[in-house]
């Protein structure tokens, strides 16, 4: 089996389905409305393609049941690979399967046979949710970085307080003035201050 790629246009979709006819017709229809699609006929094909370091797809659309590997297994792998967003396709619409797919992080669930007219808005909704989640993760990372920087600056100030027997405000001013003189960022000087103490204590 091979992985096929359509010309680059809009959002990048990785389609994974063992039914070649469904895969081809779905890809052609999505290409026709501006999506860029890559197709894989098995979980193994999809995993190999992802392992080759290709550009991160905006959304993976995968079948639940496929010979040689479950789409749900691939879904777990996608979560490990930088939270690659995905939605599920299945001939089954039972509540248990839908609930399990949702628990695994599926952003949408569509039932076969595929109706392209219904699939397109489902994909659009999944892409919108994926963008929202990405923004939330980015904001959380920025917040965590800010908290980490604040902690490290506070540690550096504490070191200066001990070394120079200064109060906190005076120690912070000294750290800030030193950063200006050395033309470096406050956080970089804080890291250097902490590292110097850690080196001495080795």
Q: Which residues does each predicted region cover?
A:
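C-terminal output helix
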Residues: 96, 114-123
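Acidic catalytic/metal-coordinating carboxylates
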Residues: 41-42, 68-73
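Active-site residues of response regulator receiver
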Residues: 62-63, 90
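C-terminal output/effector regions of signal-responsive regulators
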Residues: 131-132, 138-202
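Short amphipathic alpha-helix used as the core "switch/output" element in two-component signaling
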Residues: 47-48, 72-83
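Acidic, metal-coordinating helix/loop segments flanking the phosphotransfer/catalytic sites
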Residues: 39-59
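Conserved acidic segment of CheY-like receiver
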Residues: 7-22, 26-30, 60
